[in-house]
Structures are given as structure tokens and as C-alpha cells.
């Protein structure tokens, strides 16, 4: 399709868990479609180790999913973190993830890469914490923030947890918009989506 101007890798899973294949895919895309914009989405755990590669490949936009900046809150969002061959649970895993996310964002901004953070908003878990995330995002120099409503999914920890209403998300975006610009056109694309936003 001639109307495709962006190629992004977002999953399923975290693309940087298999960084070699992800980066090679970007290399191949850049080789044959040099005009397209390259975007990467990640939880940030492995990103610090590959920031130079990301910059060298001309990946201009990176999204980091940041659902908390406080480990006490993050431990209620993430059941475990697998890092350097070990599994960490609870506060230990949360601390590692948040430290790596912060390092990712700082290093990406040092390379002048556009950084967006995605925050999945979960009532009674991190919703009241979102303004603090936005304030920290401003301090990091994040370019854009996307507040995403959590959708309960069967057989997951939040399957019986309500998601935020559209009004709650809209109010949140208005409340924190003075910290960092808010993305409002997200269509929650599948990882294998192809086409325009209006086709999502």
C-alpha cells in the first residue's frame, strides 16, 4: 500500500524480549522502504541496552508503557518481572522495571528520539496515581502521553475489575494535560494491524 507512512512494532508480547529479531526487522524495512517512519513500543525493560541501535536505525518514535512510577503501586499492576534470566515478584520486580523504564526514557531523549508513554488506567489501582506519572513524564521531557482505559480480559488478574469510563478518561486527560500533551486519537490497534486509523 502506497498510503502507509509508518511501520511500528508493538508485540504481541514485548518486542525487545527478542531484540535481535525486532531490530533486524526494522533494518529490513528501512532497506526496502526508506521513506517510512519507524516506531517501537516496549515496556522499557530491555530498551536501555539497545538505545544506540535504535538511534542508528533511525527509529524516530518510541513508546514506553509506564503504568506507575511508585513501586508500591506498580507491584499491583505487574505480577512479575523477568530480568537477566531471573524472575522477580512484588516490590523487587516493580523496582527493577521502573528503574529500567526511567533509564530508557532518559537515554532515548538524550538521542533526541520522540518518546510517548502509554498508561493503562485501572480504577482503584493506579488511576489516582496517573497525575504523578504525568508530572514525572514532564520532568523526563516526554513528548506525548496516551491514557488507555483498562479493558477487563477473561482469565487475567483484572478480569472482574471495572475499567474506567470514557468520562473518567476524558477528565483525566484534561486534568493532566498541562504536564504533557495528551494523545486522544488512539484506536487500540492490534499488533498486526495494517491501514489507516479511520480503518481501525
Report each predicted region and the residues it spans.
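Short Fe-S-cluster ligation motifs
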Residues: 1-12
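Conserved AdoMet/S-adenosylmethionine-binding subsite of the radical SAM
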Residues: 16-148
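A structural signal for short coil/turn segments at secondary-structure junctions
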Residues: 1-2, 33, 112, 180
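Auxiliary Fe-S-binding modules of radical SAM enzymes
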Residues: 131-200
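Short, well-ordered beta-to-alpha junction loops that form the rim of enzyme active sites
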Residues: 12, 120-121, 191
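Contiguous N-terminal and early-domain "leader" segments and peripheral loops that mark the onset or edge
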Residues: 3, 65-67, 171
Amino acid at each position: 500500500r502506497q498510503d502507509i507512512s509508518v511501520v511500528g512494532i508493538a508485540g504481541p508480547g514485548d518486542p525487545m524480549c527478542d531484540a535481535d529479531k525486532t531490530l533486524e526487522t526494522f533494518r529490513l524495512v528501512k532497506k526496502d522502504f526508506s521513506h517510512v517512519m519507524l516506531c517501537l513500543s516496549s515496556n522499557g525493560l530491555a530498551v536501555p541496552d539497545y538505545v544506540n541501535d535504535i538511534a542508528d536505525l533511525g527509529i524516530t518514535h518510541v513508546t514506553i508503557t509506564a503504568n506507575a512510577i511508585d513501586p508500591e503501586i506498580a507491584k499491583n499492576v505487574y505480577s512479575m518481572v523477568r530480568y537477566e534470566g531471573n524472575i522477580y515478584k512484588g516490590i523487587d520486580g516493580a523496582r527493577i522495571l521502573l528503574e529500567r523504564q526511567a533509564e530508557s526514557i532518559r537515554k532515548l531523549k538524550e538521542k533526541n528520539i520522540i518518546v510517548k508513554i502509554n498508561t493503562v488506567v485501572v480504577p482503584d489501582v493506579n488511576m489516582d496515581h496517573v497525575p504523578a506519572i504525568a508530572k514525572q513524564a514532564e520532568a523526563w521531557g516526554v513528548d506525548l502521553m496516551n491514557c488507555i482505559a483498562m479493558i477487563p480480559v477473561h482469565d487475567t488478574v483484572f478480569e472482574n475489575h471495572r475499567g474506567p469510563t470514557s468520562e473518567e478518561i476524558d477528565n483525566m486527560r484534561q486534568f493532566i494535560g498541562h504536564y504533557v500533551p495528551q494523545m486522544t486519537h488512539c484506536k487500540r490497534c492490534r499488533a498486526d494491524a495494517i491501514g489507516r486509523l479511520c480503518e481501525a
